[in-house]
Amino acid sequence: MAETPTVKLKGKDRIVVWPAYFDADRSRSEGRKVPKRLAVRNPRLTELRHIAEKLGLNPKVQRDKRYPKRWWDDKGRLIVDKVESKRKTLLMIAEKLKERRES
């Protein structure tokens, strides 16, 4: 397994993106951050990375990270460039993810 890249998050120019943010099976209190209409079942880190690359967000994959609300679930996370607010960035990714799943 590849080593997790070290990414500095102290500045306001990067955003953490967890697959849980896009999971249709989760409620808002369980970590979903996008509207149900844009959420998908079982979002994968590889899908999110591919979409973030297409959007020019310079994604960094960290596979060994665990979403704090579900620490037993080792799906990893992405670190992406902040080009808009976190909410707008997540909505952009969610729209592309939904399109990709429906095609």
Curated annotation (Swiss-Prot):
Keywords: Cytoplasm, Ribonucleoprotein, RNA-binding, Signal recognition particle. It comes from the Archaea. Pfam families: SRP19. One of its GO terms (biological process) is SRP-dependent cotranslational protein targeting to membrane, signal sequence recognition. One of its GO terms (cellular component) is signal recognition particle. Its main location: cytoplasm. The keyword Ribonucleoprotein applies. One of its GO terms (molecular function) is 7S RNA binding. It is found in: Cytoplasm. Belongs to the SRP19 family. Involved in targeting and insertion of nascent membrane proteins into the cytoplasmic membrane. Binds directly to 7S RNA and mediates binding of the 54 kDa subunit of the SRP. Part of the signal recognition particle protein translocation system, which is composed of SRP and FtsY. Archaeal SRP consists of a 7S RNA molecule of 300 nucleotides and two protein subunits: SRP54 and SRP19. PANTHER family: SIGNAL RECOGNITION PARTICLE 19 KD PROTEIN (PTHR17453), SIGNAL RECOGNITION PARTICLE 19 KDA PROTEIN (PTHR17453:SF0). HAMAP family: SRP19. This is Signal recognition particle 19 kDa protein. The gene is srp19.
